[in-house]
């Protein structure tokens, strides 16, 4: 289904901050013969957005649809091959659009970072999407495209090199600068409220395999909680601290492994951290950043401080200014070792504010990939992830617009090495041999000014 439609890609939420950025990206970069539409609640506001996009968007149709109106969502889904949506918080009001696309056989992509929303989407829409042929793809922005594609590419490199399965794998955010939007804040507050109100939902969010297609089949690998404090990592040889997006990214990556039949390996362990290097200031920076993360979490949970944050940060529908978006960037490394004893390094980098400039590129290219690259995509349908829905096809698109997604082996396979799939995993050495040029030395730049 979905092949004979009026439009190729529809941007739902095009009048919001993130939606305008995605629409602008498509106006500038989509091939001229791609049929694109703008959707939202107000035809007048949609027309205003279209007028600001220039000549490329002059003929783009406007579709009026409301998340509170299932009939309008059904019509929207049936009109397009792909719907990309930026309307959040998704948990509060996004499931109806997922259901409409799943039933219509329409591919869907969003920017959610909400574990509870994705779990509900899996439980309610997996069967319908698998039956209709729809690809429902969550987390198509900074969370969780770099993580998900990065690990997939490492897996493919290791397999091509005969290095076996992935074992301990760590994503390190080595540098980043960007802004924070009101929509992101609203999503964080909404999930926090739900977790506080329900012990069951709290346990689900804390489960490392919350998004697994078969929780009972997941391997028992011991403690896989996300890092919640500063610590010196003897294997990476640097100070590390918590990474704000680990709670969603790690679960998406683990789902990708399971959806692919645990292709990365049954003993694949994955975590994400912020890297602070090994210099004299590193422990202070790591401890300070960790304390700041905990203070922010406490502030979101406490009524008076939450209200203060609402006043200081942009309201939903607003976000960082043009200068912040243009001068932002992110740099990520992913370290892995394999069952044959090899080590690989992945590098993911992009210019532009991660949460908005870079994310608008990721979601825009996701929409084009789903619409135009069908013959290159994995033969899957259902509630998927960026890696399992698009894989290398999306990586190729992102590279073509300036993103770096690279892998390399940083140690050679030992002579006569064999995969250790049937052997017990050895514990990590406290101080393994140092591998030259395989770990970041810079300090993380965190700049979340509400400009």
Model-derived regions: residue spans:
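C-terminal catalytic/substrate-binding lobe primarily of soluble NAD(P)-dependent oxidoreductases
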Residues: 2, 156-431, 437-438, 442-451
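N-terminal Rossmann NAD(P)H-binding glycine-rich loop of SDR-like oxidoreductase domains
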Residues: 9-27
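Rossmann-fold cofactor-recognition segment
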Residues: 53-69
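Glycine-/Pro-rich loop/turn segments that contact NAD(P) or position catalytic residues
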Residues: 89-207, 255
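A short, Lys/Arg-enriched amphipathic alpha-helix followed by its capping loop at the start of a domain
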Residues: 25-33, 260
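Structural motif
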Residues: 8, 81-82, 107
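Conserved Rossmann-fold cofactor-binding substructure of NAD(P)-dependent oxidoreductases
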Residues: 64-80, 86-89
């Amino acid at each position: 289904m979905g092949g004979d439609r009026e439009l190729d890609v529809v941007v739902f939420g095009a009048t919001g901050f993130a939606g305008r950025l995605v629409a602008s990206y498509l106006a500038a970069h989509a091939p001229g013969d791609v049929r694109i539409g703008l959707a939202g609640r107000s035809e007048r506001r949609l027309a205003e957005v279209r007028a600001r996009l220039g000549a490329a968007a002059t003929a783009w149709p406007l579709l009026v649809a409301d998340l509170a109106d299932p009939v309008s969502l059904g019509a929207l889904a049936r009109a397009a091959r792909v719907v990309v949506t930026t309307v959040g918080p998704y948990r509060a009001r996004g499931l109806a659009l997922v259901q409409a696309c799943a039933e219509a056989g329409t591919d869907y992509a969003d920017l959610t970072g909400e574990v509870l929303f994705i779990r509900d989407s899996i439980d309610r829409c997996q069967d319908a999407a698998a039956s209709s042929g729809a690809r429902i793809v969550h987390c198509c922005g900074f969370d969780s495209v770099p993580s998900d594609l990065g690990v997939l590419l490492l897996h493919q490199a290791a397999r091509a090199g005969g290095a076996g399965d992935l074992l301990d794998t760590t994503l390190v955010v080595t540098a980043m600068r960007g802004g924070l939007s009101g929509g992101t804040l609203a999503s964080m507050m909404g999930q926090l409220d739900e977790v506080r109100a329900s012990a069951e939902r709290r346990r689900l969010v804390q489960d490392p395999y919350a998004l697994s297609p078969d929780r009972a089949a997941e391997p028992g690998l011991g403690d896989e909680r996300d890092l919640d404090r500063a610590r010196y990592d003897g294997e990476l040889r640097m100070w590390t601290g918590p990474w704000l997006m680990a709670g969603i990214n790690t679960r998406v990556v683990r789902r990708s492994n399971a959806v692919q039949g645990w292709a990365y390996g049954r003993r694949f362990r994955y975590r994400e951290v912020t890297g602070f290097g090994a210099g004299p200031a590193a422990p202070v920076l790591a401890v300070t950043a960790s304390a700041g993360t905990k203070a922010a979490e406490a502030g979101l949970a406490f009524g008076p401080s939450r209200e203060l944050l609402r006043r200081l940060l942009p309201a939903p529908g607003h976000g960082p200014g043009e200068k912040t978006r243009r001068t932002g960037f992110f740099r990520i490394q992913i370290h892995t070792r394999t069952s044959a004893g090899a080590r690989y390094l992945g590098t993911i980098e992009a210019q532009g504010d991660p949460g908005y400039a870079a994310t608008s590129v990721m979601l825009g290219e996701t929409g084009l990939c789903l619409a135009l690259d069908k013959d290159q995509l994995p033969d899957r349908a259902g509630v998927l992830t960026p890696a399992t829905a698009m894989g290398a096809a999306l990586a190729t698109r992102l590279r073509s617009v300036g993103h770096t997604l690279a892998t390399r082996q940083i140690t050679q396979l030992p002579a006569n090495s064999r995969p250790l799939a049937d052997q017990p995993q050895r514990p990590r050495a406290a101080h393994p041999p140092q591998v030259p040029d395989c770990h970041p030395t810079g300090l993380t730049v965190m700049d979340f000014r509400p400009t």
